[in-house]
Every structure is written in structure tokens, then in C-alpha cells.
């Protein structure tokens, strides 16, 4: 059974070999590196390649779209603004959603309140009718 030291030395050697290959590819030039990857994109805009890759894999996630948008704006020289909602806008959205829910529940709450009030009044009436007259007991 190999020791931990032997395994770590072997791993380090493999990593060094991979680093050497990467450095060698970087030195051999752009064309050879493109051939190694299997793409010839030296004259294509980057976002076209990203679009083709995204369409071929049916990727419609926000990361791909954001990357495409950033690249287009970099190439056109326009600054890229990330469309994020700030904290205030999120709070406003929550308040609007809460208001919408309250508006939908308002008629139901009114009916429930009326029924509850009627039940309370009915219970009070029953207790009043069941209790003996206190006014007559005090006079005697």
C-alpha cells in the first residue's frame, strides 16, 4: 500500500505535467491552441460563439444571457449595467404583492367578520335571557 507521501508526490508530478502542457500550448500560438480546442474563432466575435453554444444546448439561463449582453456591450464600447433590483425596489414589490392579497381577501374577511359578530351577539342574547333579573333581586 503506497504511503501518503508517495501519493502526494505522484499527484504533484501529474499537476506539474499538466501545468507544463498548458504553458506549452500558451507558447505555441493562438492557432495551435484553437486547433487543440477544436474551434477556429479567431475572427468571430465571442458572443456569436456563446450564442451558438447556448442554442445548441438549449441553455436559456440568466448566466448565458448576461454573458452575451456583457460581451456585446464591451465590443460596442457601451458600459454594461447589471439589471438588479435594489433593496428598496424589492420592498416596494413586496408591499404591492401584500396589497393585492389584502384586496383579494377583503370581501371574504368582511363576510367572516359579519358572521363572527352575529355569533357573538347571539351568545350574548342567550346569556342575557338565561340570567335572572338582577334588578329585581337588589330591590328586596
Swiss-Prot record:
One of its GO terms (biological process) is mRNA splicing, via spliceosome. The modification Phosphoserine is found at residue 139. Its main location: nucleus. The keyword Transmembrane does not apply. The keyword Manganese does not apply. It comes from the Eukaryota. Keywords: mRNA processing, mRNA splicing, Nucleus, Phosphoprotein, Spliceosome. Belongs to the NTC complex (or PRP19-associated complex), composed of at least CEF1, CLF1, ISY1, NTC20, SNT309, SYF1, SYF2, and PRP19. GO terms for cellular component: Prp19 complex; U2-type catalytic step 1 spliceosome. Involved in pre-mRNA splicing. As a component of the NTC complex, associates to the spliceosome to mediate conformational rearrangement or to stabilize the structure of the spliceosome after U4 snRNA dissociation, which leads to spliceosome maturation. This is Pre-mRNA-splicing factor NTC20. Present with 1430 molecules/cell in log phase SD medium. It is found in: Nucleus.
